[in-house]
């Protein structure tokens, strides 16, 4: 589960389902399903430091892969949206679900969280990829930008 920052961007696609039949890929139907899948990637950091992971989906909503796009400090993480978008292009994704954790346990979106979402949405629109959701995770709860009408 190494971060895919500047190298190996295609590894996420190769590692997740490259040879799998499309019908065997997990289909994401809800933010709860996204949370349940994503939470497993945050096991080592949920209460210690922030990380940002992205899920990449095909046009049918089936999971192509999951990639760590940033690991940072206790209260914030820096996300380069170009990395998120590049990985989406390499994996031939039609949609992205961005996520990050709040070690504080709060599911309240911050101004930087909102700014990141806005910037990523603009980037996605420019290249024909849909930002499907941005999920803020804690140990026992989550906030979905889509569910809250914030996307």
Identify the residue ranges that each predicted region occupies.
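Single conserved hydrophobic/aromatic residue that forms the stacking wall/gate
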Residues: 1-13
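Residue-level preference for short coil/turn positions at secondary-structure junctions
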Residues: 5, 48-50, 92
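Non-catalytic interface/targeting segments
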Residues: 11-70, 146-151
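Short, flexible, glycine/charge-rich loop motifs used to bind or transfer phosphoryl groups or to couple energy/partner
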Residues: 1-3, 43-45, 86-87, 125
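Active-site-proximal loop/helix of nucleotide/amide-processing enzymes and allied scaffolds
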Residues: 15, 58-60, 70-151
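Short, conserved clusters of charged catalytic residues that mark active-site
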Residues: 4, 33, 37, 79-80
């Amino acid at each position: 589960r190494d971060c895919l920052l500047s190298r190996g961007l295609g590894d996420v696609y190769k590692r997740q389902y490259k040879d799998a039949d499309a019908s065997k890929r997990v289909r994401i139907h809800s933010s709860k399903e996204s949370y349940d899948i994503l939470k497993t990637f945050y096991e080592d950091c949920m209460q210690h430091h922030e990380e940002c992971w992205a899920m990449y989906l095909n046009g049918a909503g089936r999971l192509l892969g999951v990639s760590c796009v940033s690991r940072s400090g206790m209260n914030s993480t820096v996300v380069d949206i170009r990395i998120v978008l590049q990985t989406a292009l390499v994996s031939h994704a039609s949609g992205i679900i961005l996520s990050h954790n709040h070690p504080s346990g709060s599911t309240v979106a911050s101004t930087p969280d909102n700014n990141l979402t806005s910037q990523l949405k603009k980037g996605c629109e420019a290249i024909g990829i849909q930002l499907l959701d941005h999920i803020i995770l804690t140990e026992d709860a989550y906030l979905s930008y889509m569910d809250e009408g914030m996307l």
